[in-house]
Regions:
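Short acidic DE-rich linear segments
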Residues: 2-3, 62-68
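Acidic, low-complexity, intrinsically disordered interaction modules
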Residues: 9-61
Length: 68
């Protein structure tokens, strides 16, 4: 179990603690990317909204890769 905390900022500027970086990254990859790039779609989680831009996706990918 990974005890490291990961946070992202929602579209309206609120800080969101990612409960499980593995599931979060997998969902973004499966549903909000095309050819490994953020596709500018909208991801909603627990009332927080995130536009999955290239920068947003890469920042989450960096967090995911840092857990190793």
């Amino acid at each position: 179990m990974n005890s490291k905390n990961y946070f992202v900022t929602s579209d309206d500027g609120r800080k969101y603690k990612i409960p499980d970086i593995n599931n979060f990254f997998k969902h973004l990859t499966d549903f909000h990317t095309e050819n490994g790039h953020g596709n500018n779609s909208l991801h909603e989680e627990n009332g927080f909204y995130f536009t999955v831009t290239e920068d947003f996706y890469n920042s989450v990918k960096k967090m995911f890769n840092s857990k190793k």
